[in-house]
Amino acid sequence: MYLQTLHLRNFRNYQHQHVDFSAQKTILIGNNAQGKSNLLEAVELLASLKTHRTSRDADLVKQGEATARIQAQIQRGYGTVDFDLLLRNQGGRTLKLNGEILRRQLDGLGTLNAVEFSCLDLDLVRGGPDCRRQWIDNLLIQLEPVYARILQEYQQVLKQRNALLRTAKKLHRNQAAIPTDLTQQLTLWDLQLAATGSRVTRRRSRGLLRLMPLAQAWHRDISSQTETLEITYCPNIPWQQDDPHHVQQACLDKIEQRRQAEQHQGSSMVGPHRDEIEFSINGTPARFYGSQGQQRTLVLALKLAELQLIETIIGEPPLLLLDDVLAELDPSRQNQLLDTIQTRFQTLITTTHLNSFGADWLKHSQILTVNQGTLQPYARPLSETYGP
């Protein structure tokens, strides 16, 4: 898997920019707020059709423009793919693969696989449960693009069910009886929540089971065999057997237990939208007691495990996007990460300086300067020599 070219038009602070990626490793160097992260965000959009920085396409369109466009040529094991994504300021997208408009944009998922690692990923450990749910969901979409539809179906069911529960809450507040038709509607949506929720929770469990031994091995290596990582999936629906009927029944049983509380609160209190994932180091919860260094080691191990798992399942190494992350790692962890990458993964790295990179890395990298949304080849000082 190789991103050969990228063309941006009116995307963020880029007006018109074309990039030919001429090396396995590309370093984007520049001061803050020049557009380094914006370029990585464009690649993230190609991989996941969303960005961790905003949920509004209007934020992605250059100020004063009506549309933005991202075009890319991607080399896969099965051939070359032309990817064309048009974003509109007023909403609505058009996605083309090899010139053909996709009726369902989710069909574009899986064309490009990428793992992003930024300073914001420390929230994986110290942030709330929603950060960890979003993390595992994003990984599962990379591994199995159909999971995006499964997740979308669940969220639609959740939205409809919550609307009914809000109606029930108003009736409770007014001390009015809940009409039979509302009770019947809720029963139907209970069944839908159990059916769609079981698909989400079972896939999350299986994904974490596959990821955990890889993350544990990386964590032991990075910590010089001094620490043991444990990842525990804590589903909101307690289930013991990986069987759809068993999980659905477990969900319905818990809904029945929490029915009065849900109607009083006006929202769904049962389902995978309330799942938690816990990380512990040597038996101690990393979220509350892990040092900053331990938390960074944990996230680094998770990212390396993601790369390994995606490569194993997809059969091709994904892209790696490193957004100003080297500054967050000490020299030992920097070396661990850079040594692992080498030429195995196509890598795009943003940085404000080149001090973290060895001579061999710089010699075999494409280095681009980013300045106010414009890319230029890095002008190496005459004193810089990276060998013959």
Curated annotation (Swiss-Prot):
<dbReference type="GO" id="GO:0005524">
    <property type="term" value="F:ATP binding"/>
</dbReference>
<keyword id="KW-0235">DNA replication</keyword>
<dbReference type="InterPro" id="IPR018078">
    <property type="entry name" value="DNA-binding_RecF_CS"/>
</dbReference>
<keyword id="KW-0963">Cytoplasm</keyword>
<keyword id="KW-0067">ATP-binding</keyword>
<keyword id="KW-0227">DNA damage</keyword>
<protein>
    <recommendedName>
        <fullName>DNA replication and repair protein RecF</fullName>
    </recommendedName>
</protein>
<dbReference type="GO" id="GO:0000731">
    <property type="term" value="P:DNA synthesis involved in DNA repair"/>
</dbReference>
<dbReference type="GO" id="GO:0006302">
    <property type="term" value="P:double-strand break repair"/>
</dbReference>
<keyword id="KW-0742">SOS response</keyword>
<keyword id="KW-0547">Nucleotide-binding</keyword>
<dbReference type="InterPro" id="IPR001238">
    <property type="entry name" value="DNA-binding_RecF"/>
</dbReference>
<dbReference type="InterPro" id="IPR003395">
    <property type="entry name" value="RecF/RecN/SMC_N"/>
</dbReference>
<dbReference type="GO" id="GO:0005737">
    <property type="term" value="C:cytoplasm"/>
</dbReference>
<comment type="function">
    <text>The RecF protein is involved in DNA metabolism; it is required for DNA replication and normal SOS inducibility. RecF binds preferentially to single-stranded, linear DNA. It also seems to bind ATP.</text>
</comment>
<dbReference type="Pfam" id="PF02463">
    <property type="entry name" value="SMC_N"/>
</dbReference>
<comment type="similarity">
    <text>Belongs to the RecF family.</text>
</comment>
<dbReference type="InterPro" id="IPR042174">
    <property type="entry name" value="RecF_2"/>
</dbReference>
<dbReference type="GO" id="GO:0006260">
    <property type="term" value="P:DNA replication"/>
</dbReference>
<dbReference type="GO" id="GO:0009432">
    <property type="term" value="P:SOS response"/>
</dbReference>
<feature type="binding site">
    <location>
        <begin position="30"/>
        <end position="37"/>
    </location>
    <ligand>
        <name>ATP</name>
    </ligand>
</feature>
<keyword id="KW-0238">DNA-binding</keyword>
<dbReference type="GO" id="GO:0003697">
    <property type="term" value="F:single-stranded DNA binding"/>
</dbReference>
<dbReference type="InterPro" id="IPR027417">
    <property type="entry name" value="P-loop_NTPase"/>
</dbReference>
<keyword id="KW-0234">DNA repair</keyword>
